[in-house]
C-alpha cells in the first residue's frame, strides 16, 4: 500500500561516535556462522601457507650457513628448489583463500542488504518521516559496501597474522632466546601506539559515514525536486547547501585520514627500530661466536614476519574503522522497533466499511496536538468529505485510519473493532487510496495498475482504464499497457499519472476508499468525466474524500469541517452553507459566491 503524504520532523539515528566496537565486531562476525565449514577450510589453507611462510626465514639462514659461508655452491640448487616450492605453494594457497573469502563476503553482503530492506518494510512510517531518505540509502548501499571491502581481506589477514606470529615466535625461541626477547621488546610500544591512534580515529570515521548520509540525502532530494529548484531559480542556494555539507564531509574525512595515516609511519619506525636492535645485538653475538651470520639473517626474516601482520593491520586500519562505523549504522536500523500487531489481533472479514473516531487526540512530536478530541461516525457506504485549510488535520486523520501512526488518546473503530485489534495487513488491504502525490513504480503500466490487485486480468485492467478515461492515452504509449515507466512515471504528465493512480484504486476494489486530492492535477474536462465515474465507483463503498476544491464534494453524504485540528462543523453541503459558518467562508472565498439563506 502506498504511503499517504507525511510531515518530516528532522533526522534521527544520530550518535556522536561508535559506542562499542567490540560488540559491533562480534555481532558482525556472527554473519559468518552459516559458513563455518568454508571458514574452517580457509583457515586450514591459511595455517598451511603461514607455516610454509614461517619456514622460509629458517631455510634462508640455513642456506647462508650451509651454502655461502663454507662456499658449498653445489648444494645451492637443492635449497633454491625447496624455497621455490614453498613460495609457489604459499602463493597458490593465498589465491585460493582470497577467492573463497571474496565469495563468502559477497554472501554476507547479500544477507545484510536483504535484512536491511526487509526491516525497512516493517518499521513504522514515522521512521521515514524523521530520517533523511538519502541517509537510509547510504546505509543500505555505502555502509554495506564498506563491510564487504573489509570482510574479503581483513579476516584472512587477521587469522594469518595470528598463525604467523605464533609460528615466528616459536621458531625464534628455538633458534636463539636472546634475539627472540630483543625482537619481542617492540610489542608493547606497538600496542600502545595502536590503542592511542584507534581511540582518536574511531569517532571521526563514524562521523564521516553520518555526514556522507546527509550528503546522499541532499543529492536524492535535489534530483527528485529538480523541476521545482529550476522553477524558482534556487540552483545557487542548493549548491551552497551542498557545499556546506560537502565541506563538513571534507573536514571530517580529512581528520579521519590524517589520524589513521599517522599509524603506518609510526609502525614503520617501530619496525626499523626492531631491525636495528636485531642487527646490533646479532652482530655483537656473532663477533663472540655465539651465533652465526645465517642466524642473524633468519632473525631479520622472522622480525619482518613478526611485524608484517601488525603492518597489514595498520594499513587496513582506516578500512576496519570505517567498516565498524558502518556496521554500527546498519545495526541501528536492524535494531529499530517494528510495527507489531496485537497478539490477539484479528482479520477483517466481510468488511462493511463502518468507521468511527471516538475522542481522538494525536500529536506527531508528543508535544503539540495535531488532532484534538476528534469524534465522528461514518456509516457503511457513506461518502464523507474532510474539508479545511492546510494543516487542519485532514491528512492526519487518514494516516491514523491507515495505522501509519497510533492515536495518543481515544479510539478508531472499523466495523465496530478498535483498529489496534486488527492486523495491519488486513486493515490496509481493505482500504484503497489515491494520493495527492502520485506514486508509480519503474515497471510496466499494467504492473502499476495491478499493484493493489495482482490477480486482475487484462480485461479487468482495460475496463477500469476505460472507466477512468485513461485507456485512450495508455493505448498511445509506445508499448501500450506494456510500456515501462521511468522513475515515478516522470515521462507522463501529472494528469496522466493521477489517472493511473485512480485506475489502480478502481482495480483494488476495496470496501473503503480514500481520495486525497484525487483530481487536483487533472484538467476541467477530464475532471468532470472522472467525477462521474468516481461517484459510480463509490456506490456501496465507504468513501473519504479530501479536497480543497469544494465544488467536487457538494454531493457528499457528510462534510466534516476541520480547523486547527478540531471539528468545527459537520453536515451536508446545503446545511453548512445555510449556517454561514466556517464552511460558508471557505466556499465563498473559493468561488466568490454569496448564497442567501433560505
From Swiss-Prot:
Pfam families: ABC_membrane, ABC_tran. Its main location: membrane. InterPro entries: AAA+_ATPase (IPR003593), ABC1_TM_dom (IPR011527), ABC1_TM_sf (IPR036640), ABC_transporter-like_ATP-bd (IPR003439), P-loop_NTPase (IPR027417), Type_1_exporter (IPR039421). It is found in: Cell membrane. PROSITE patterns: ABC_TM1F, ABC_TRANSPORTER_2. Residues 39-322 form the ABC transmembrane type-1 domain. GO terms for biological process: transmembrane transport. Keywords: ATP-binding, Cell membrane, Membrane, Nucleotide-binding, Transmembrane, Transmembrane helix, Transport. This is Uncharacterized ABC transporter ATP-binding protein TM_0288.
Amino acid at each position: 500500500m502506498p504511503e499517504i503524504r507525511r510531515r518530516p520532523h528532522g533526522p534521527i539515528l544520530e550518535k556522536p561516535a561508535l559506542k562499542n566496537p567490540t560488540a559491533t565486531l562480534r555481532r558482525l562476525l556472527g554473519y559468518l556462522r552459516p559458513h563455518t565449514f568454508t571458514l574452517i577450510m580457509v583457515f586450514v589453507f591459511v595455517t598451511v601457507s603461514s607455516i610454509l611462510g614461517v619456514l622460509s626465514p629458517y631455510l634462508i639462514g640455513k642456506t647462508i650457513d650451509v651454502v655461502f659461508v663454507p662456499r658449498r655452491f653445489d648444494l645451492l640448487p637443492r635449497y633454491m628448489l625447496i624455497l621455490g616450492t614453498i613460495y609457489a605453494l604459499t602463493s597458490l594457497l593465498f589465491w585460493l583463500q582470497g577467492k573463497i573469502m571474496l565469495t563468502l563476503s559477497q554472501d554476507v553482503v547479500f544477507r545484510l542488504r536483504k535484512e536491511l530492506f526487509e526491516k525497512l518494510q516493517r518499521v513504522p512510517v514515522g521512521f521515514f518521516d524523521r530520517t533523511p531518505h538519502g541517509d537510509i540509502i547510504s546505509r543500505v548501499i555505502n555502509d554495506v559496501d564498506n563491510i564487504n571491502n573489509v570482510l574479503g581481506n581483513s579476516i584472512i589477514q587477521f587469522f594469518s597474522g595470528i598463525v604467523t606470529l605464533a609460528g615466528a615466535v616459536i621458531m625464534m625461541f628455538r633458534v636463539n632466546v636472546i634475539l627472540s626477547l630483543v625482537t619481542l621488546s617492540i610489542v608493547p610500544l606497538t600496542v600502545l601506539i595502536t590503542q592511542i591512534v584507534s581511540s582518536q580515529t574511531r569517532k571521526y570515521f563514524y562521523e564521516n559515514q553520518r555526514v556522507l548520509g546527509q550528503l546522499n540525502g541532499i543529492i536524492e532530494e535535489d534530483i527528485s525536486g529538480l523541476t521545482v529548484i529550476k522553477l524558482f531559480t534556487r540552483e545557487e542556494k542548493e549548491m551552497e547547501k551542498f557545499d556546506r555539507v560537502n565541506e563538513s564531509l571534507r573536514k571530517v574525512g580529512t581528520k579521519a585520514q590524517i589520524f589513521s595515516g599517522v599509524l603506518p609511519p609510526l609502525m614503520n619506525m617501530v619496525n626499523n627500530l626492531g631491525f636495528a636492535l636485531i642487527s646490533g645485538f646479532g652482530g655483537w653475538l656473532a663477533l663472540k661466536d655465539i651465533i652465526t651470520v645465517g642466524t642473524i639473517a633468519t632473525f631479520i626474516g622472522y622480525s619482518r614476519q613478526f611485524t608484517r601482520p601488525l603492518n597489514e593491520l595498520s594499513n587496513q586500519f582506516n578500512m576496519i574503522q570505517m567498516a565498524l562505523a558502518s556496521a554500527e549504522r546498519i545495526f541501528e536500523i536492524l535494531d529499530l522497533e517494528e510495527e507489531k500487531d496485537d497478539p490477539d489481533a484479528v482479520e477483517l472479514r466481510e468488511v462493511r466499511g463502518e468507521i468511527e473516531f471516538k475522542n481522538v487526540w494525536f500529536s506527531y512530536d508528543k508535544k503539540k496536538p495535531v488532532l484534538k478530541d476528534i469524534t465522528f461516525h461514518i456509516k457503511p457506504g457513506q461518502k464523507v468529505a474532510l474539508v479545511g485549510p492546510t494543516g487542519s488535520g485532514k491528512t492526519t486523520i487518514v494516516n491514523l485510519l491507515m495505522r501509519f501512526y497510533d492515536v495518543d488518546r481515544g479510539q478508531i473503530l472499523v466495523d465496530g473493532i478498535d483498529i489496534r485489534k486488527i492486523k495491519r495487513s488486513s486493515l490496509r488491504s481493505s482500504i484503497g487510496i489515491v494520493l495527492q502525490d502520485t506514486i508509480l513504480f519503474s515497471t510496466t503500466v499494467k504492473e502499476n495498475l495491478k499493484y493493489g490487485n495482482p490477480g486482475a486480468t487484462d480485461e479487468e485492467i482495460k475496463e477500469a482504464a476505460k472507466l477512468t478515461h485513461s485507456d485512450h492515452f495508455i493505448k498511445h504509449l509506445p508499448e501500450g499497457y506494456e510500456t515501462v515507466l521511468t522513475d515515478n512515471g516522470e515521462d507522463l504528465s501529472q494528469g496522466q499519472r493521477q489517472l493511473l493512480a485512480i485506475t489502480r484504486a478502481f482495480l483494488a476494489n476495496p470496501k473503503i476508499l480514500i481520495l486525497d486530492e484525487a483530481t487536483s492535477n487533472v484538467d476541467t474536462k477530464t475532471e468532470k468525466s472522472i467525477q462521474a465515474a468516481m461517484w459510480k465507483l463509490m456506490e456501496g463503498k465507504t468513501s473519504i474524500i479530501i479536497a480543497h476544491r469544494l465544488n467536487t464534494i457538494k454531493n457528499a453524504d457528510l462534510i466534516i469541517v476541520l480547523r486547527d485540528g478540531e471539528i468545527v462543523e459537520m453536515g451536508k453541503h446545503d446545511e453548512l452553507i445555510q449556517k454561514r459558518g466556517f464552511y460558508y467562508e471557505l466556499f465563498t472565498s473559493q468561488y466568490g459566491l454569496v448564497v442567501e439563506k433560505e
